[in-house]
Amino acid sequence: MFVYGTLRRGQPNWGRLLAAAAERVVAGRLAGVLLLDCGHYPAAVERPGAGEAVGEVVWIRSDAWLATLAGIDHLEGYDPADRDRLYDRVLRSVDTADGPVDCWVYVAGPMLAGSARPAVTGGDWVAYCADQPGAQ
């Protein structure tokens, strides 16, 4: 799974949903997306040539996969039957230092993709948040 926002290590949802299930974590980059600032979380909008999202590829233990996926689906508001869902879960190729890896990634669903939001400068949510006024 590729994570680029609040599910990254050190971010609010890492400990809640991924830390105990993670088997391995490496840095990764997802090309062809524009990362948007949705307030307390980002959304990756698929736009070929638009830029990239900086994040992490997380390998999840097989015995924890289904429960972890269900928890993240819930967090991301992903329900394929809901036309107003916040995110879509799609399989995409993510670049890592060891080469490309096919990963599940949550990209902006119909509701978020059509909204007017500011872009996350540089495509790195963690760095972007650290640069905001009042960041510690």
PLM feature segments, named:
Residues M1-Q136:
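Glycine-aromatic micro-motifs
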